[in-house]
């Protein structure tokens, strides 16, 4: 009874709090000639991959027999698996199981292939709150009884090594706080499986994360590594029509991160309603620092299972239609998998259909997800993962590969032609326009694009944030005007024409 009342009271307290606006001044973008690697890492368009089941255990991917199965019974949440192992083994022995798992997984990463062949820009690495500084911050949290195991297994040390290895290959890292205390959703990949998503209803959990755990991640892992592209503060938050707890936590988390490391992107979940969070980000003036993560799977819902593959593919431009004019989006997870019921309704060559499905997804993402995509997932303990695996999807030509090179040659005559075309169209329309703003816009865009290409042949991403900041700089330098739309059109035309392979 007391516990029930306490939970209701905590929920009431959170629901009465509105999220605060950004309280930190963000650093200005450098001019194109001074763009550094750290800035490009944070803004470039990503061709990425998830390291699923490395830290947050998922037995269907890795470690099923070695850690997650005890006396013939499989445990699909990490908390349950480690708790059961401790009934049979010492903390030292269970920690060794984990550290052996980390080593096996990491040793199998082919960095040369990732960098040179797949030409991946970034890794999304799911972690749990229990991994941060090897379990140092578990007081009053559900994983507290398992602290000693993580102290000995040293996942934080392994994460640091991964980040350094990625840096050597010019690969970025997105630290994804996949597992939150109480869970942001009801699934076992939150670390525990209680059947409820309690995190956003318990203020003590949210406070612990934004006051203690996020600062620890930043101070020990992100500040010293230029290839950290962002910090994801939640994974797959549940849909909520009135998400006051989410808004409270996100605003506190964003402000915590930006006070400690101004300019570090903060990634939030779309809660399966992209427009809801675009509106909120816009309202709170977070759009220059926040990226909204949306996951695209077409193999789980009854609605998708009822369709044939060709219908799903045809619908992608309509079903993946983020409001990208209002905010920056990334597809943090997607795959080439369709359900068996879908395949039962589909005729034709399966490999060809999977190829069309994956290629169409990537093409749609390139128009609406300004921070790119992260395929789920890198590798499996046994086999290549098939339509869940990066390697087979790359090797079959299903996923696009970025070309190599770092020297974009832009035809000056093409730029002059575009400028002339603009002037010719608008001249004689009855006003004295400011076509020089259009020219400034397209030339600034081209300079930025060339600067990005010089680092690992990167493309400009986070278009909403990038354009907004460049526009503000321009207005500050050359004053506002009723003809700023000409600059807007010029910069956008530059992106449309030249920010592509």
Swiss-Prot record:
Record EC number: 3.2.1.-
Location in the cell: Mitochondrion intermembrane space
SUPFAM superfamilies in the record: (Trans)glycosidases (SSF51445)
Record InterPro entries: Glycoside_hydrolase_SF, Glycosyl_hydrolase_5
Active site, UniProt feature: 236, 333
Keywords, in A-Z order: Glycosidase, Hydrolase, Mitochondrion
Superkingdom, taxonomy of origin: Eukaryota
One cellular component term from this protein's GO annotations in UniProt: mitochondrial intermembrane space
UniProt GO BP: glucan catabolic process
Major localization class: mitochondrion
GO molecular function annotation: glucan endo-1,6-beta-glucosidase activity; glucan exo-1,3-beta-glucosidase activity
Remarks, miscellaneous: Present with 1960 molecules/cell in log phase SD medium.
Annotated family: Belongs to the glycosyl hydrolase 5 (cellulase A) family.
Name listed for the protein in its UniProt record: Uncharacterized glycosyl hydrolase YBR056W
Species, as recorded: Saccharomyces cerevisiae (strain ATCC 204508 / S288c) (Baker's yeast)
């Amino acid at each position: 009874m007391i516990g029930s009342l306490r939970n209701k009271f905590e929920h009431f307290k959170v629901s009465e709090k509105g999220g605060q606006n950004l309280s930190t001044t963000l650093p200005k973008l450098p001019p194109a000639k001074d763009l550094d690697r750290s800035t490009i890492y944070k803004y470039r368009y990503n061709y990425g991959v998830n390291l699923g089941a490395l830290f947050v255990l998922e037995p269907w991917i890795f470690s099923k027999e070695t850690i997650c199965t005890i006396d013939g019974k499989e445990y699909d949440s990490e908390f349950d698996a480690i708790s059961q192992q401790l009934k049979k083994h010492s903390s030292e022995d269970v920690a060794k199981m984990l550290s052996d798992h980390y080593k096996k997984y990491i040793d199998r990463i082919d960095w040369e292939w990732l960098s040179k062949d797949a030409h991946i820009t970034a890794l999304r690495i799911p972690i749990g709150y229990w991994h941060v500084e090897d379990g140092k911050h578990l007081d009053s949290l559900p994983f507290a009884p398992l602290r000693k195991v993580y102290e000995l297994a040293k996942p934080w040390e392994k994460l640091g090594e991964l980040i350094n290895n990625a840096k050597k290959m010019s690969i970025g890292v997105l630290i994804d706080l996949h597992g939150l205390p109480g869970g942001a959703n009801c699934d076992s990949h939150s670390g525990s499986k209680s059947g409820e998503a309690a995190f956003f209803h318990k203020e003590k959990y949210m406070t612990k994360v934004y006051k203690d755990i996020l600062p620890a991640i930043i101070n020990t892992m992100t500040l010293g590594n230029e290839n950290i592209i962002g910090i994801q503060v939640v994974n797959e938050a549940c849909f909520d029509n009135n998400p006051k707890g989410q808004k409270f936590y996100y605003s506190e988390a964003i402000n915590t991160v930006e006070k400690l490391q101004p300019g570090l992107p903060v990634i939030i979940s779309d809660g399966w309603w992209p427009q809801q969070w675009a509106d909120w980000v816009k309202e709170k003036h977070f759009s220059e620092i926040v990226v909204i993560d949306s996951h695209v799977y077409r193999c789980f819902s009854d609605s998708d299972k009822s369709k044939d593959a060709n219908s799903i593919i045809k619908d992608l431009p309509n079903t993946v239609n983020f409001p990208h004019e209002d905010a920056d989006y990334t597809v943090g997870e997607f795959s080439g998998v369709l359900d068996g019921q879908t395949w039962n309704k589909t005729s034709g060559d399966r490999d060809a259909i999977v190829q069309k499905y994956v290629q169409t997804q990537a093409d749609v993402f390139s128009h609406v997800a300004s921070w790119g995509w992260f395929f789920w997932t890198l590798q499996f303990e046994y086999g290549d993962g098939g339509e869940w695996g990066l390697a087979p999807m790359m090797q079959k030509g299903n996923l696009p590969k970025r070309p190599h090179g770092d020297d974009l040659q832009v035809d000056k005559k093409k730029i002059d032609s575009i400028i002339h075309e603009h002037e010719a169209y608008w001249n004689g329309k009855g006003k004295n326009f400011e076509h020089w703003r259009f020219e400034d816009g397209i030339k600034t865009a081209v300079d930025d694009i060339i600067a990005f290409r010089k680092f690992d042949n990167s493309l400009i991403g986070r278009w909403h944030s990038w354009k907004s900041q460049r526009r503000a700089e321009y207005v500050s330098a050359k004053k506002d005007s009723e003809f700023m739309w000409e600059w807007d059109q010029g910069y956008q035309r530059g992106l449309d024409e030249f920010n592509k392979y």
